């Protein structure tokens, strides 16, 4: 596991160097990000349901159940805990967002694939259906801080390319559709394999654009990081096991929860004219430290 994370971290470093040397950054990163989100990542999700042994359809409902439970409880955490982590009232919503949402779609799939194998990407995609819905409803409320505005949820999120690929993958597994021709599955697999290195290169390139001060963070950033990367995932791991969920489902859910802060936080802060300093810092710090904390968390799976 440590070797896997070191491999991923090495690709992040290559991205950082490429950003510093000018090979990456700016418009290139934006276009590559769009490619990953809208093409390679959906291909990875679909390929997870088309190659090798068909994923277990019996896990779909438990995955949706554990994900729904997770985000219901995390909603309470996001609205209650920030008041104890920051003295700035205006930052409570942003801190809550950082506590609640991990970078599932962009970093979660590559990490899950590296730890559990490509087939597990399908299970992570099922978990991400609830996560994506929550980001653009509860997440928007947290960032904007206005409970009275009914414009929070955008229906187009439900039929974005990543979500459509998740629906299709669930349909393939639920109906037991096997033996999909290689002329379809192999190109999807090859395109999907671009996701891991491309996503990590972009993360490294993004880090290369940040100042040293941002990389150091502050007390609120580090306390939020401890909850985001360690305390919350460990808490949910033991809670879900105690509730009798399948151990494989619990393990994948734990890794998904343990992802660094979702990049959507920065996007939403920009959209609603909120200060991006905290969300940028905590996204950076959690991304760096997750290279250490995720291998540590997987030790739980062997206990």
Identify the function of each model-found stretch.
Residues 1-303:
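Alpha-helical transmembrane segments of multi-pass small-molecule/ion transporters
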